[in-house]
């Protein structure tokens, strides 16, 4: 029998734990604060930022949405980042991606103070993760959310073969480091990989983050595998589908995430979790 991984339910439990931590911080006079920087009016980005803001407010956090027009200058966004770096009531800064092409994404992310870099994309935090350093530092919220799902449904990760389809710096690469740090054997492939089926069919855990709807079919999946679908693709009929053909692959997978309702809710719940982490680590 296939387990449908209920990301919404696990996110709900995580949010309850986060709310308890927020209440405890408030007793100490600390209100966790997050600012989301949004450039332009891309419909998907607007929805994502509103969801993040609603979740933060629901958990009792301070939440600011800093909006800029799509033709904003690099200097204006940098000025805002520096302002929030210096604001003691803000513990977490997030830049909603993607950004317009005229903006230098790397420079903006590097401008965020590492101790407020809630998505873990600043090179100092990336380096700590890559080196498996001890201590406290944020990591990619989506990647950490995936790890939470895996820990919920699997007894162990150590020793398992993992294939990640996709090589993005936002999800795939930090997830690769998190898995390696738990002694998994990780292979990363892309749509340019020859004989991609060989790698997917040998995976105990298959993570698909390629941005191509219904890419993976059941004949590409090892029977009994755990399949994590990171893709979010809006089709012509307005339905959302993942990068995995869910109805097909669920016939062979032991555990599988749906789209929507799998990884997505975990990303936002983990963002809230890490905002509180930053408030606790830096109080």
Swiss-Prot record:
**Positions with a binding annotation for NADP(+):** 166-168, 232
Spell out the SUPFAM superfamilies in the cross-references: Aminoacid dehydrogenase-like, N-terminal domain, NAD(P)-binding Rossmann-fold domains
The pathway noted for it is: One-carbon metabolism; tetrahydrofolate interconversion
Any one cellular-component term (Gene Ontology) = cytosol
User: Which keywords does this Swiss-Prot/TrEMBL entry list?
Assistant: Amino-acid biosynthesis, Histidine biosynthesis, Hydrolase, Methionine biosynthesis, Multifunctional enzyme, NADP, One-carbon metabolism, Oxidoreductase, Purine biosynthesis
Substrates-to-products reaction catalysed: (6R)-5,10-methylene-5,6,7,8-tetrahydrofolate + NADP(+) = (6R)-5,10-methenyltetrahydrofolate + NADPH; (6R)-5,10-methenyltetrahydrofolate + H2O = (6R)-10-formyltetrahydrofolate + H(+)
User: Coiled-coil stretches, from where to where?
Assistant: none
The answer, when asked if Electron transport is one of the entry's keywords, is no
Q: What is its EC number?
A: 1.5.1.5, 3.5.4.9
Give the superkingdom in one word.
Bacteria
Q: Which InterPro entries match?
A: Aminoacid_DH-like_N_sf, NAD(P)-bd_dom_sf, THF_DH/CycHdrlase, THF_DH/CycHdrlase_cat_dom, THF_DH/CycHdrlase_CS, THF_DH/CycHdrlase_NAD-bd_dom
GO-annotated biological processes: L-histidine biosynthetic process; methionine biosynthetic process; purine nucleotide biosynthetic process; tetrahydrofolate interconversion
Task: Name the Gene3D superfamilies on file.
Answer: Leucine Dehydrogenase, chain A, domain 1, NAD(P)-binding Rossmann-like Domain
Q: Could you confirm whether the keyword Hydrolase appears in this record? A: yes
Provide the GO MF annotations for this entry.
Answer: methenyltetrahydrofolate cyclohydrolase activity; methylenetetrahydrofolate dehydrogenase (NADP+) activity
This protein's assembly is summarised as: Homodimer.
Similarity comment: family membership = Belongs to the tetrahydrofolate dehydrogenase/cyclohydrolase family.
What is the annotated role of this protein in its UniProt record?
Answer: Catalyzes the oxidation of 5,10-methylenetetrahydrofolate to 5,10-methenyltetrahydrofolate and then the hydrolysis of 5,10-methenyltetrahydrofolate to 10-formyltetrahydrofolate.
**PANTHER family of this UniProt entry?**
C-1-TETRAHYDROFOLATE SYNTHASE, CYTOPLASMIC (PTHR48099:SF5), C-1-TETRAHYDROFOLATE SYNTHASE, CYTOPLASMIC-RELATED (PTHR48099)
Q: Which HAMAP family match?
A: THF_DHG_CYH (MF_01576)
Name of protein: Bifunctional protein FolD 1
Q: Which organism is it from?
A: Lactobacillus johnsonii (strain CNCM I-12250 / La1 / NCC 533)
Gene that specifies this protein: folD1
């Amino acid at each position: 029998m296939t387990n449908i991984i209920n990301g919404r339910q696990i996110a709900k439990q995580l949010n309850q734990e986060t709310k308890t931590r927020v209440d405890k911080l408030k007793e100490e006079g600390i209100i966790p604060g997050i600012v989301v920087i949004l450039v332009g009016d891309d419909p998907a980005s607007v929805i994502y930022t509103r969801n993040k803001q609603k979740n933060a407010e629901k958990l009792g956090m301070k939440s600011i949405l800093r909006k800029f027009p799509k033709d904003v200058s690099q200097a204006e966004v940098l000025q805002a980042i520096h302002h929030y770096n210096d604001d003691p009531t803000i513990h977490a800064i997030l830049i909603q991606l993607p950004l317009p092409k005229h903006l230098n994404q790397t420079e903006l992310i590097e401008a965020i103070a590492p101790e407020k870099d809630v998505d873990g994309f600043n090179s100092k935090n990336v380096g700590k993760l890559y080196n498996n350093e001890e201590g406290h530092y944020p990591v990619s919220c989506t990647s950490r959310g995936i790890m939470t799902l895996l820990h919920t449904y699997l007894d162990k990760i150590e020793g398992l073969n993992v294939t990640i389809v996709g090589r993005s710096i936002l999800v795939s690469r930090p997830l690769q480091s998190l898995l390696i740090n738990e002694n998994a054997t990780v292979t990363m492939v892309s749509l340019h990989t020859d004989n991609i089926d060989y790698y997917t069919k040998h995976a105990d855990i298959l993570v698909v983050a390629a941005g191509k709807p219904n890419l993976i079919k059941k004949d590409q999946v090892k029977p009994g595998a755990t399949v994590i679908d990171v893709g979010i693709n809006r089709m012509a009929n307005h339905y959302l589908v993942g990068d995995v053909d869910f109805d097909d692959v669920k016939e062979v997978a032991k555990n599988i995430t749906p789209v929507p309702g799998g990884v997505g809710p975990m990303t936002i719940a983990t963002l809230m979790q890490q905002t509180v982490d930053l408030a606790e680590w830096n109080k």
